[in-house]
């Protein structure tokens, strides 16, 4: 063999593998599965791939709940005064020596801590809630919440990039329901109700503006709650703010005829409270006086409406 001769390479000849009868041999182009001794974590979904309310996970539709101390408050549109009404209901129940938690589940608007004037207080926000196993210790969570007039508050900061998943919302509600007498949830226009079981099974309260448009929206909103299997709601009528002088709002009797349901209230607007909220001072006008009547814009509440709503809630607890 000289330098121009190609060296011979010894080839190793193997006999073809013999497979047991009935089991085909793998082909060369077939991928060989990798051996894994763990379950790989799921790929994070993009915001466009996340399941919407119409595609709720099966677990969200079958989970049962035994809690009867959850109040879900919603409205057919924004600007009715729902957040102040929820806050004042929590405040009045706390004054009656009920331990109360107030949850901001309005992930579109949020800012309940700003509304109450406690945005600088240290405490847990909804964007910081982490429940990887769908479970949160209630006592531990209670101690991490900020306090407002004896009410524990779990606000949502909408400027945060992280929006809680439905099971984290469910876990937070259940944790606080286990350790408080009452849990009041400001659910905005109800975007989470279909996917969060405890929001559907709780006592439903609708804030309805006493105007033609407001009542039409309230009727549509009530139909939506009915389609999700919620119990019959308690409807609270709220007088519209900023109505021209000489033009009256829709009366309670007319509202009841249109909605074919009992309407509590009316809740009257408060100019002083509206000014405090718009200036970022929180709900202080109501707390400084005995006869409170919150409302306007994102505010609302009257002595009459709150008394009736409290009575309805306490009677429902007695029946439960």
Which positions does each model-derived feature cover?
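Well-ordered beta-strand positions
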Residues: 182, 202-204, 234, 261, ...
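Inter-motif core of Ras-like GTPase G domains
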Residues: 178, 191-212
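Cytosolic-facing regulatory segments adjacent to core modules
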Residues: 135-148, 152-190, 195
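Walker A/P-loop phosphate-binding motif and the immediately C-terminal alpha-helix
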Residues: 64-116, 176
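Conserved beta-strand segments of the P-loop GTPase G domain that flank and frequently precede/overlap
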Residues: 73, 155-157, 184-186, 205-210, ...
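Acidic-aromatic/histidine active-site loop/patch
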Residues: 1-70, 119-137, 223-237, 253-258, ...
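Phosphate-binding loop that captures ATP/GTP phosphates
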Residues: 93-152
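Beta-strand-loop-alpha "switch" segments that mediate conformational coupling across diverse proteins
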Residues: 239-242, 252-284
């Amino acid at each position: 063999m000289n330098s121009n001769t190609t060296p011979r390479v010894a080839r190793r000849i193997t006999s073809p593998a013999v497979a047991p009868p009935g089991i085909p041999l793998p082909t060369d182009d077939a991928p060989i599965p990798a051996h894994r001794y763990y379950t790989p974590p799921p790929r994070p979904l993009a915001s466009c791939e996340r399941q919407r309310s119409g595609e709720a996970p099966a677990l969200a539709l079958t989970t049962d709940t035994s809690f009867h101390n959850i109040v879900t408050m919603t409205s057919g549109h924004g600007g009715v005064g729902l957040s102040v009404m929820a806050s004042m209901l929590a405040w009045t129940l706390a004054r009656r020596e009920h331990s109360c938690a107030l949850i901001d589940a309005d992930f579109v608007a949020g800012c309940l801590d700003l509304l109450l004037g406690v945005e600088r207080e240290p405490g847990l926000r909804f964007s910081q809630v982490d429940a990887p196993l769908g479970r949160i210790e209630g006592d531990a969570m209670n101690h991490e919440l900020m306090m407002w007039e004896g009410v524990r508050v779990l606000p949502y900061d909408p400027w945060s990039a992280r929006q809680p998943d439905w099971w984290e919302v469910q876990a937070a509600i259940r944790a606080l329901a286990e350790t408080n007498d009452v849990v009041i949830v400001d659910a905005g226009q109800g975007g989470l109700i279909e996917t969060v079981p405890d929001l559907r099974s709780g006592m439903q309260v609708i804030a309805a503006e006493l105007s033609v448009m407001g009542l039409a929206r309230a009727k549509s909103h009530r139909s939506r709650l009915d389609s999700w299997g919620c119990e019959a709601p308690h409807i609270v009528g709220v007088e519209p703010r900023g109505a021209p002088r000489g033009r009256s709002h829709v009366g309670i009797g007319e509202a009841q005829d249109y909605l074919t349901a009992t309407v509590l209230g009316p809740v009257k607007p408060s100019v002083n409270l509206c000014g405090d909220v718009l200036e970022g001072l929180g709900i202080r006008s109501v707390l400084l006086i005995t006869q409170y009547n919150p409302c306007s814009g994102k505010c609302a509440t009257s002595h009459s409406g709150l008394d009736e709503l409290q009575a309805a809630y306490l009677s429902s607890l007695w029946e439960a």
